[in-house]
């Protein structure tokens, strides 16, 4: 469960390393974001000489959470870290590579992210 002030790792090669959630997109007063939700975040740590800079406000989609995700068939998926992929206004990823496993629940809304992922669980 991602809420405002939560720090997340960046799971792509866009140039940012760490994000902090500011807001959850989708409802006026939603408290938590889960896998597949879009958040507004600020870059807390960035790689030098990249297009993204520290303290820049961006949008990202949550791809991994420590809080378990329960599927309809009873399977439970839990990751070791909270991670997000930076996206533009159209929902396309800014990076060209995705690091780590991605949940199958992203397939409907974010097909481009799933196609770049090395492993889909």
Curated annotation (Swiss-Prot):
Q: Which GO terms describe its biological process?
A: translation
Summary of the function given for this chain in its UniProt record: Component of the chloroplast ribosome (chloro-ribosome), a dedicated translation machinery responsible for the synthesis of chloroplast genome-encoded proteins, including proteins of the transcription and translation machinery and components of the photosynthetic apparatus.
Originating species: Spinacia oleracea
Tell me which PANTHER family the record gives.
Answer: 50S/60S RIBOSOMAL PROTEIN L14/L23, LARGE RIBOSOMAL SUBUNIT PROTEIN UL14M
Q: What is known about its subunit structure?
A: Component of the chloroplast large ribosomal subunit (LSU). Mature 70S chloroplast ribosomes of higher plants consist of a small (30S) and a large (50S) subunit. The 30S small subunit contains 1 molecule of ribosomal RNA (16S rRNA) and 24 different proteins. The 50S large subunit contains 3 rRNA molecules (23S, 5S and 4.5S rRNA) and 33 different proteins.
> SUPFAM superfamilies of this UniProt entry?
Ribosomal protein L14
A Pfam family it matches: Ribosomal_L14
Please report any disulfide bonds recorded for this protein chain, giving both cysteine positions: none
Keywords attached to this entry: Chloroplast, Plastid, Ribonucleoprotein, Ribosomal protein, RNA-binding, rRNA-binding
Top-level taxon of origin: Eukaryota
> What is a GO molecular function of this protein?
structural constituent of ribosome
Q: What is its main location?
A: plastid
Annotated compartments: Plastid, Chloroplast
Question: Of which family is this protein a member?
Answer: Belongs to the universal ribosomal protein uL14 family.
The GO cellular component terms are: chloroplast; cytosolic large ribosomal subunit
The family database entries (InterPro entries) matched by this protein are listed as: Ribosomal_uL14, Ribosomal_uL14_bac-type, Ribosomal_uL14_CS, Ribosomal_uL14_sf
* Protein name per its UniProtKB record: Large ribosomal subunit protein uL14c
């Amino acid at each position: 469960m991602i809420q405002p002030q939560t720090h997340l790792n960046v799971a792509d090669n866009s140039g940012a390393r760490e994000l902090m959630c500011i807001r959850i997109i989708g409802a006026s007063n939603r408290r938590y974001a889960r896998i597949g939700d879009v958040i507004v975040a600020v870059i807390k740590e960035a790689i030098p000489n990249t297009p993204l800079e520290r303290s820049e406000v961006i949008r990202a989609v949550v791809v991994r959470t420590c809080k378990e995700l329960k599927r309809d068939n009873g399977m439970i998926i839990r990751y070791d870290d909270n991670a997000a992929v930076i996206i533009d206004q159209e929902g396309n990823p800014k990076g060209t590579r995705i690091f780590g496993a991605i949940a199958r629940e992203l397939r409907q809304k974010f097909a481009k992210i799933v196609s770049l992922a090395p492993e889909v669980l």
